């Protein structure tokens, strides 16, 4: 319970913030403090209790939840391409930075690698997926679920190819999917 908190991760977070010249952040620190208990408990109950008790705002609760129960985890062995995909799915450079700093604290070392990952939104900005539903409709596909399926398959193909294809080649890929 709350009586036996392990402050190891919190201490690592303080070192990591300092090492990366990151301003102190209460939500990240709270996540580091709560992480051992939440991880052990495996539920959102403690998260809700603490959030209610501290009267956290909706956005603070969301940040805390994203740090403690991330949909996408960064791993130190991830390539730049894998990290870019997570950045793409998060679609939020601040959330990506939070997650990278949190993982760096959990790793508590390997600072150069994590610094490179944290800087990814600035050094390697992500392109916007260049096609939309109306592009699929313009190819003669009737409105409906098939449009979304084609978009999702094409986006996955684009991600697997490290965002390298432009609008023209993506539309050619959709045409190929339509023929198959």
Q: Where in the sequence are the language-model features?
A:
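Conserved, hydrophobic alpha-helical core segments of structured domains
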Residues: 1-109
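Charged substrate- and nucleic-acid-binding regions of tRNA-handling and nucleotidyl-transfer enzymes
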Residues: 100-180
